[in-house]
């Protein structure tokens, strides 16, 4: 399935120095977002900062949203994750995509201009309405929570 989403380039380096976001393979779910910095940025352990991507999107379709997710290599190798864990972009948002970056590692990390820092995934949305009830129909699991389904 392919859906058209409006994209606004806010930084002239996109499309010249850095490519537009694109799927790396036919099976890719996410497109890489880059740090559109003017100079290298060093994050000390525990630091968080908002990093511009130089892009704005307008999804328009209320049946879709976008999520900003971490890149696995940055988190595993360097302790660089998203400060808000997951970024949710609503269909009616039109501003610049910013990435909250958190250095949860033990060493300084220097981010370079144009470095791939996160990925953008477009996802379907279901807007639910609630039906108030006094009791639920009994399920096999019931109220069992954290760890109740076992480890094996």
Swiss-Prot record:
Pathway: Pyrimidine metabolism; dUMP biosynthesis; dUMP from dCTP (dUTP route): step 2/2. It comes from the Bacteria. One of its GO terms (biological process) is dUMP biosynthetic process. GO terms for molecular function: dUTP diphosphatase activity; magnesium ion binding. Keywords: Hydrolase, Magnesium, Metal-binding, Nucleotide metabolism. Its cofactor is Mg(2+). It catalyses: dUTP + H2O = dUMP + diphosphate + H(+). It is an enzyme of class 3 (hydrolase). Its EC number is 3.6.1.23. Belongs to the dUTPase family. This enzyme is involved in nucleotide metabolism: it produces dUMP, the immediate precursor of thymidine nucleotides and it decreases the intracellular concentration of dUTP so that uracil cannot be incorporated into DNA. This is Deoxyuridine 5'-triphosphate nucleotidohydrolase. It comes from Aeromonas hydrophila subsp. hydrophila (strain ATCC 7966 / DSM 30187 / BCRC 13018 / CCUG 14551 / JCM 1027 / KCTC 2358 / NCIMB 9240 / NCTC 8049).
